C-alpha cells in the first residue's frame, strides 16, 4: 500500500488556501495580503510539491492557471442560449427613446433598472458543472464561439471552483475580459522595447492576450474578468439582475462595485454624467454604461429583437476624436525586425494631449482603412492610450494620392523585407546585421540557451552598443580588456571574467549556434532538428524551402523563414565573421537505430515510472522529438493519468495513442 506523505499533503492544502485567499484579496477587495514576490514564491513551492505528488494534483489548484500546451487552432463552443450583443445609443434623446419603448412594452412608467459600466474588452461565457470550471468560449457569432478554456483558466480572478454554497449544478456566467489601463501601458512599453507592434488600445490587448494559441503567454498578461450576466442554469438564479449579481459575487466572482439600481430618466442621466466624469481615473477602460431592466420576469415580457435584448441598452460615452492630416507615412523598424507603418500627423490636441504620430500597425490595416499621405483623418485617443487613426474622410482626399506600400528593402540596413505566411507583420530579414535589431540580436545570441555567455547581460549590451564597440554579434569575439575597462562599473577582474566566458563560448554545438542566430520561427527544438538532419551548417545554408520541408517538424512557414535568413548577404557575412573568430562546433552525427528515429511524440497526463523531463530525454536519445501539441504529423501520443485534451485531439486526428506500459515496451523492441 502506498504511504501517504501527510506533511506534503497538508502543505499543499495550506498553500492552495493561501493563494486563493490572496487572489480574492487582490482582485475582489483591492487589499493585497501578499507581495508579488511572496505570491510567486508560494506558487513555485506549490508547483514543486504537486509535481512530486501527482496523485494530489487538482484542476482547481492555483498552479493550473499557468497555461497549457499550445494549440494549433481553437475549437468551437456552442451556446444553447445565444450570447447576443447590445443595441447602442449615443445621446440623451436616444436613451430617452429606449426607456419610453420599455415603459410602453411593460405598460407602466415605474421600471426599476440596473446600471453598470460597459467594459471595453472581450465577451466570454464560462461554464461550470458541479461548481468546477469546465469550458470557456468567446462570443463569436452569438451561437458559436471559440474555445478559450485553457486561456481563461489563467485569469487570476476567475474562480476555477465556485465558492460559497447553493450554486446550481450547471451554470454559465457571462462577462468581459479586460486589462487594466496601467498594465496596458506597461505591456505596450515592453512590446516597444522588444521591437513588437504596440496594441492600439486596452480592448485589443485583452482580445489579443486571450486569443493566444499558447496559454502560457496569456498567463503572463494581467487580465481580469467582470461578470455582467449569465446563460444556461439548471435552476433559476433569482428574481432580479442585481440579486443574481450578488449571488455571483458570493460564488467567487469579482462583480463591479459600480453596479447601481436606478429608476427614472433624471436619475439615469445623473449617474451617466457622474461616471463620465470619473472614467479617466478608473483602472479599466469603459466606453459607456449598460442599463438593463432589473426585474427578470419583465425581461421575459419584453423579449429580444433579431440581434439584441429589448430590455437592455448600451449608452456610449462621446469618444475623444479630432480631425487632422496625414503628412507622411514612415516605415519604422523595431528591435525584432518588425516593420510598422507610422502616420506622421499634423499636430492636433486629442483629449488634452498633442498627437503628432499614430501607429498604423501593419500593411493590412493601412489597406483596410485605405490611408494615404495627404488624407484628412479622424484620430481617436480613448482614455490615456495610444492614438489611433479611426477612419479616412474620403470626401476631403486630395487628387493624385497614392496607396502606401511596405518597402521591399529595410529602410535601416537595406536587407530584404519579407512577410511570412499566416503573419500580419513584415520583417527585415537582416537580423544579424540590421542596426535597428542590434541590441535584441546580441542579447539573444548571448543568452543561456544560446551561446551562454555569462555576464553579458542587457545593461552591458546597451553599453557595448552605445559606445560603438559592438555592431554585430561577431564583434563580441574581438573585445579586449582595455575596451571593456572603459565601460561603467567594469574593472579589470570583471573584464577578464567576461573575456574568459566569451572565449569558452567559441566551442559550442550546432543546435545552440543555430538557435543563437535568432532565425524567426526557429526555437531550440527546431534548431536541434535542423542540426540532426543536415549535420553541419554549410548544407543547411544551401538548402531550399522544399528540402527543408523534408524535416518532420518543419512546415512551409518555418522553411521559408530559414531559407530567406540564410539568403541575406549581410547575415552570411556575419556568420563568416563568427567562424573566422573561432566559433566552432562538432559535426552532428545523425542518430541511427533509435526506436523513435525521425518521429514526433506528444506526452499528456502524469506518468508513474518517470517524470515528463525523463521521458523527453529518453525519446530524444532514441532519435525522436517531443512536441507540445498534437497535429497530423504526430507519430504517437503517450497517455498517462488524467490526460488532457491532447488525447481527445489525437483520437479525432487518428493519431495512435500509447499507454505508459506500451511506451516503455517500445524501448526494448527491435525496429
From Swiss-Prot:
Cofactor(s) required, per the database record: Mg(2+); Mn(2+)
Pfam families hit by this protein: BRCT, DNA_ligase_aden, DNA_ligase_OB, DNA_ligase_ZBD, HHH_2, HHH_5, Nlig-Ia
Keywords from the named record: DNA damage, DNA repair, DNA replication, Ligase, Magnesium, Manganese, Metal-binding, NAD, Zinc
Keyword field contains Transcription regulation: no
Chain positions recorded as NAD(+) binding sites: 36-40, 85-86, 116, 139, 176, 292, 316
Domain of life where this protein originates: Bacteria
Function: DNA ligase that catalyzes the formation of phosphodiester linkages between 5'-phosphoryl and 3'-hydroxyl groups in double-stranded DNA using NAD as a coenzyme and as the energy source for the reaction. It is essential for DNA replication and repair of damaged DNA.
Alphabetized NCBIfam families for the sequence: dnlj (TIGR00575), PRK07956.1 (NF005932)
Protein name, per record: DNA ligase
Organism annotation: Acidithiobacillus ferrooxidans (strain ATCC 23270 / DSM 14882 / CIP 104768 / NCIMB 8455) (Ferrobacillus ferrooxidans (strain ATCC 23270))
Amino acid at each position: 500500500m502506498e504511504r501517504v506523505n501527510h506533511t506534503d499533503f497538508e502543505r499543499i492544502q495550506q498553500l492552495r488556501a493561501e493563494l486563493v485567499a490572496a487572489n480574492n484579496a487582490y482582485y475582489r477587495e483591492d487589499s493585497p495580503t501578499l507581495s508579488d514576490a511572496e505570491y510567486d514564491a508560494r506558487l513555485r513551492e506549490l508547483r514543486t510539491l504537486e509535481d512530486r505528488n501527482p496523485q494530489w494534483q487538482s484542476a482547481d489548484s492555483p498552479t493550473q492557471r499557468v497555461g497549457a500546451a499550445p494549440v494549433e487552432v481553437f475549437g468551437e463552443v456552442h451556446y444553447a442560449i445565444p450570447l447576443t450583443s447590445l443595441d447602442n445609443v449615443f445621446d440623451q434623446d436616444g436613451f430617452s427613446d429606449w426607456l419610453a419603448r420599455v415603459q410602453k412594452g411593460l405598460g407602466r412608467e415605474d421600471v426599476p433598472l440596473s446600471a453598470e459600466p460597459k467594459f471595453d474588452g472581450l465577451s466570454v461565457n464560462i461554464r461550470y458543472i458541479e461548481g468546477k470550471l469546465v469550458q470557456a468560449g468567446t462570443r463569436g457569432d452569438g451561437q458559436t464561439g471559440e474555445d478559450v478554456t485553457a486561456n481563461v483558466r489563467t485569469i487570476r480572478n476567475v474562480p476555477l471552483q465556485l465558492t460559497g454554497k447553493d450554486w446550481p449544478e450547471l451554470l454559465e456566467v457571462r462577462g468581459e475580459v479586460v486589462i487594466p489601463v496601467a498594465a496596458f501601458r506597461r505591456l505596450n512599453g515592453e512590446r516597444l522595447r522588444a521591437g513588437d507592434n504596440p496594441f492600439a488600445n486596452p480592448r485589443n490587448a485583452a482580445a489579443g492576450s486571450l486569443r493566444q494559441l499558447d496559454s502560457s503567454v496569456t498567463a503572463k498578461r494581467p487580465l481580469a474578468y467582470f461578470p455582467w450576466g449569465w446563460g444556461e442554469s439548471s435552476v433559476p438564479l433569482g428574481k432580479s439582475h442585481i440579486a443574481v449579481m450578488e449571488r455571483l459575487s458570493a460564488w467567487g466572482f469579482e462583480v463591479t462595485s459600480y453596479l447601481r439600481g436606478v429608476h427614472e430618466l433624471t436619475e439615469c442621466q445623473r449617474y451617466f454624467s457622474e461616471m463620465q466624469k470619473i472614467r479617466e481615473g478608473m483602472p479599466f477602460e469603459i466606453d459607456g454604461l449598460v442599463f438593463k431592466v432589473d426585474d427578470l420576469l419583465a425581461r421575459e415580457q419584453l423579449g429580444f429583437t433579431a440581434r439584441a435584448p429589448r430590455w437592455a441598452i448600451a449608452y456610449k460615452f462621446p469618444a475623444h476624436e479630432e480631425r487632422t492630416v496625414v503628412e507622411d507615412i514612415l516605415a519604422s523598424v523595431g528591435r525584432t525586425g518588425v516593420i510598422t507603418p507610422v502616420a506622421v500627423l499634423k499636430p492636433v490636441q486629442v483629449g488634452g494631449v498633442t498627437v503628432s504620430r499614430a501607429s498604423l500597425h501593419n500593411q493590412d490595416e493601412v489597406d483596410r482603412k485605405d490611408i494615404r499621405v495627404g488624407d484628412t483623418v479622424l484620430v481617436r485617443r480613448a482614455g490615456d492610450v495610444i492614438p489611433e487613426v479611426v477612419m479616412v474622410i474620403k470626401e476631403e482626399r486630395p487628387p493624385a494620392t497614392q496607396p502606401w506600400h511596405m518597402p521591399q528593402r529595410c529602410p535601416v540596413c537595406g536587407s530584404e523585407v519579407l512577410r511570412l505566411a499566416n503573419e500580419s507583420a513584415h520583417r527585415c530579414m537582416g537580423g544579424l546585421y540590421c542596426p535597428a535589431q542590434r541590441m535584441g540580436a546580441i542579447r539573444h545570441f548571448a543568452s543561456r540557451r544560446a551561446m551562454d555567455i555569462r555576464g553579458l547581460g542587457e545593461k552591458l549590451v546597451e553599453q557595448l552598443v552605445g559606445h560603438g564597440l559592438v555592431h554585430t554579434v561577431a564583434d563580441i569575439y574581438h573585445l579586449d580588456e582595455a575596451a571593456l575597462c572603459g565601460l561603467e562599473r567594469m574593472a579589470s577582474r570583471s573584464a577578464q571574467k567576461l573575456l574568459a566566458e566569451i572565449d569558452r563560448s567559441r566551442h559550442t554545438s550546432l543546435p545552440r549556434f543555430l538557435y543563437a542566430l535568432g532565425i524567426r520561427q526557429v526555437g531550440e527544438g527546431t534548431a536541434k532538428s535542423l542540426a540532426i538532419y543536415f549535420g553541419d551548417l554549410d548544407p543547411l545554408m544551401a538548402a531550399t524551402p522544399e528540402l527543408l520541408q523534408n524535416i518532420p517538424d518543419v512546415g512551409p512557414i518555418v522553411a521559408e523563414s530559414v531559407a530567406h535568413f540564410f539568403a541575406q548577404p549581410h547575415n552570411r557575412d556575419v556568420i563568416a565573421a563568427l567562424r573566422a573568430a573561432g566559433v566552432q562546433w562538432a559535426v552532428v552525427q545523425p542518430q541511427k537505430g533509435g526506436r523513435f528515429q525521425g518521429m514526433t511524440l506528444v506526452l499528456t497526463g502524469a506518468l508513474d515510472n518517470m517524470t515528463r523531463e525523463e521521458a523527453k530525454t529518453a525519446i530524444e536519445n532514441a532519435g525522436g522529438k517531443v512536441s507540445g501539441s498534437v497535429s497530423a504529423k504526430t507519430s504517437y501520443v503517450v497517455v498517462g493519468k488524467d490526460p488532457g485534451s491532447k488525447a481527445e485531439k489525437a483520437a479525432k486526428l487518428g493519431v495512435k495513442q500509447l499507454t505508459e506500459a506500451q511506451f516503455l515496451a517500445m524501448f526494448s523492441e527491435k525496429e
